[in-house]
């Protein structure tokens, strides 16, 4: 078997980078696999903060597994093929570690698959370290903690599992950081949107979902000031329309999430706005609406859209 590539989803967030980096280490230590961690995009500013803090180099970016001479891959923090590497259907999926819904996914052969309804893929990878009695190095503990903090907004998201609190405390101790202090510093590092173009902003953390025959792009940006982001609304809408035309998305839903007050503004464009409105029981005014208490795409947006588009 050729070298196995380990990677998270396209437009990688902190959990995608952290879980793949840590699982690559575990695969070598516990399973004696010939693996290499790579990424499907450059780290965002939040992830770059975590990597720099713990002295870890970002994984190299690849666009094709076969171009790297790999015939097998391991996916972390995702399983849906539209969110994965470009030639995912041409290689064999050797394993998956994920915490999302399972959809748009099939394999020709059996595989290792660990999917749990917890706050982050990093939480699962940490559990695998413990199950296999592999010590967690300080830098990897820091990355796993960062992945958990990122995906749960410092354990405030409704996706947070009861076990994640204990995991966070243990990882913080292993990483040698104060949980709240480090967590807020990392999250704030990811809210610097002023330096991003509108095209970059809507692609920072975006995933495509196949919903009843529609390609729906759902993106999320974190901020401490929603109004500041909405000041760029006209330019953001222009960027959304451009990417919808070029990529063939039927609809685009952008979550602008206030990480301090735990609310989101939804900015949406596309052919099925009636379904978007029905999903959240709100009325879009000038293409946007407030969604109180919403911070999680995985739990508070995608399931609702899936149900509405399927109705």
Swiss-Prot record:
Its main location: cytoplasm. Gene3D superfamilies: DHHA2 domain (3.10.310.20), inorganic pyrophosphatase (n-terminal core) (3.90.1640.10). GO terms for molecular function: inorganic diphosphate phosphatase activity; manganese ion binding. It catalyses: diphosphate + H2O = 2 phosphate + H(+). It is found in: Cytoplasm. Mn(2+) 1 binds at residues 9, 13, 77. InterPro entries: DDH_dom, DHH_sf, DHHA2, DHHA2_dom_sf, Mn-dep_inorganic_PyrPase, Oligoribo/pAp-PDE_c-di-AMP_PDE. One of its GO terms (cellular component) is cytoplasm. Binds 2 manganese ions per subunit. Its cofactor is Mn(2+). Its EC number is 3.6.1.1. It comes from the Bacteria. Coiled coil: none annotated. Keywords: Cytoplasm, Hydrolase, Manganese, Metal-binding. Mn(2+) 2 binds at residues 15, 77, 99, 151. Belongs to the PPase class C family. NCBIfam families: PRK05427.1. This is Probable manganese-dependent inorganic pyrophosphatase. It comes from Streptococcus equi subsp. zooepidemicus (strain H70). The lineage of its organism: Bacteria, Bacillati, Bacillota, Bacilli, Lactobacillales.
């Amino acid at each position: 078997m050729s070298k196995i590539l380990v990677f998270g989803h396209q437009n990688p967030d902190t959990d995608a980078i952290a879980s793949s980096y840590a699982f690559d280490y575990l695969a070598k230590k516990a399973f004696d696999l010939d693996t290499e961690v790579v990424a499907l995009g450059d780290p965002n500013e939040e992830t770059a903060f975590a990597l720099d803090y713990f002295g870890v180099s970002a994984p190299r970016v690849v666009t094709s597994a076969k171009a790297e001479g790999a015939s097998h891959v391991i996916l972390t923090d995702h399983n849906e093929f539209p969110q994965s590497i470009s030639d995912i259907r041409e290689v064999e999926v050797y394993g998956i570690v994920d915490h999302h819904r399972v959809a748009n996914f099939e394999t020709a052969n059996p595989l290792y698959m660990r999917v749990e309804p917890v706050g982050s893929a990093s939480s699962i990878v940490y559990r695998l370290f413990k199950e296999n009695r592999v010590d967690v190095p300080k830098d990897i503990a820091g990355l796993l903690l960062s992945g958990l903090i990122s995906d749960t907004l410092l354990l405030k998201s409704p996706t947070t599992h009861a076990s994640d609190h204990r995991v966070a405390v243990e990882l913080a101790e292993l990483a040698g950081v104060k949980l709240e202090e480090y967590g807020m510093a990392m999250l704030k590092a990811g809210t610097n949107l002023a330096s991003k173009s509108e095209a970059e902003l809507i692609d920072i953390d975006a995933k495509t979902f196949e919903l009843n025959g529609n390609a729906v792009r759902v993106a999320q940006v974190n901020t401490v000031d929603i109004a500041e982001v909405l000041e760029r609304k006209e330019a953001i809408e222009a960027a959304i329309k451009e990417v919808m035309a070029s990529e063939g998305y039927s609809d685009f839903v952008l979550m602008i999430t206030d990480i301090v007050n735990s609310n989101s503004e939804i900015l949406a464009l596309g052919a099925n706005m009636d379904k978007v409105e029905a999903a959240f029981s709100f009325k879009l005014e000038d293409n946007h609406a407030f969604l109180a208490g919403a911070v999680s795409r995985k739990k508070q947006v995608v399931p609702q859209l899936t149900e509405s588009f399927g109705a």
